[in-house]
Amino acid sequence: MNITDEGTPVLILNAGGITLGTESRKTMENHDRVEENRNITKALCALINSGEGKVKAHIKNPDYILSKHGIGEDLETSFKNILPSRPLDFKQYQSYFFICVEKSQSPDVSVGKPATIATNLYMRNGASSVEMNLDAAQKFLDNIKVAGGRSPSARPSDRPGDDTQEEGHIQELAAAFFKQSKLTKKENFLFSESKNVEYKSFETKKLLQRVKEILPRTVSAFANTDGGYLFIGLDEKKQEIVGFEAKNCQPKCLESEIEKCIQQLPVTHFCEEREKIKYKCKFIEVHDSGVVCKYVCALRVERFCCAVFAAEPESWHMKDGGVKRFTIEEWIKLLMS
């Protein structure tokens, strides 16, 4: 990605090549579609946060006509997520595609929110980890700032709804399961997934990779809500204990990666204590005919004192002649100003 000098005072940011059109983008390889989407949304985000200009991309498909083929559903969704309240101005000139950004579309840094591709700030919603949008993130951080942090356990008023008792029962069952020192293969367990409980089977040789993929959002979501339990080695459909084999991932290796992942999660504090993320990881033996055959990884995450991010917010701006990512401190300052 680079700035193009075309002899005009308008800033033009070159996003490289792109395949356009609803049908054409559907037939692309997923990796290529995601990479193109990322390049152009990154450029758009940077321009919106930095003033005005144009995003320029070379159209790869030669027969493309903007008015006839559209831009593509994935691009429309990504653009709306960055700038939900205003329509964007798309133009085609020969084999080039332009997105025009005017000052009126750029946030007022004194009162507005920074254009953001992903907040990377998660909460638990039911049995899922859900990313907060900008409004939810701002409210969440504002509440923590006003209170000077979060209490170690949620107040009853923080847990509204008729499902409170059931959630508490599920959490008690998960807590009892966490305390076990030995499990039996194929035995059923009695709790479902919930706001405070998630489990995965991951019966694959790529166990470590899969765990590393889900840990940031799951751990941060638990920490930002009321804490919770993550179990690796439980079958979601049959609700039975399956475990994982040590040959696919040694427990010590998995524990080390979990520790590394949690230590790397970005946090922001509004409290004096500035504590670290509190958690406990253990491995429970799974027995078959009296012999240890597999393991279940059990992770308990405590409610965090302030806010935990799955990764730094993905929000870009123009600085020193290039596209730079906001630091978490810069992003929070803009969001809460």
Swiss-Prot record:
Basic and acidic residues biased stretches: 156-166
Pfam families recorded: B3R (PF17057), SLFN_AlbA_2 (PF04326)
Tissue expression remark: Mainly expressed in the thymus, lymph node and spleen. Specifically expressed in T-lineage cells, but not in B-cells. Strongly up-regulated during the differentiation from CD4(+)CD8(+) double-positive (DP) to CD4(+) or CD8(+) single-positive (SP) thymocytes. Highly expressed in quiescent single-positive thymocytes and T-cells. The expression substantially decreases after TCR (T-cell receptor)-mediated activation.
Disruption phenotype: No visible phenotype.
Localization per record: Cytoplasm; Nucleus
UniProt entry keywords in alphabetical sequence: Adaptive immunity, Cytoplasm, Immunity, Nucleus
Disordered, as annotated region: 147-166
Gene Ontology CC: cytoplasm; nucleus
Gene3D superfamilies associated with the record: Schlafen, AAA domain
Main location (coarse class): cytoplasm
GO BP, sorted A to Z: adaptive immune response; negative regulation of cell population proliferation; negative regulation of G1/S transition of mitotic cell cycle; negative regulation of T cell proliferation; negative regulation of transcription by RNA polymerase II; regulation of cell cycle; T cell proliferation
Subunit structure: Interacts with DNAJB6; promoting nuclear translocation and ability to promote cell-cycle arrest.
PANTHER family in the cross-refs: RIBONUCLEASE SLFN12 (PTHR12155:SF2), SCHLAFEN (PTHR12155)
Family: Belongs to the Schlafen family.
Role played: Protein expressed in resting T-cells, which is required for maintaining T-cells in the quiescent state. Acts by promoting cell-cycle arrest of T-cells through inhibiting the expression of cyclin-D1 (CCND1).
Protein name: Schlafen family member 1
Organism per entry: Mus musculus (Mouse)
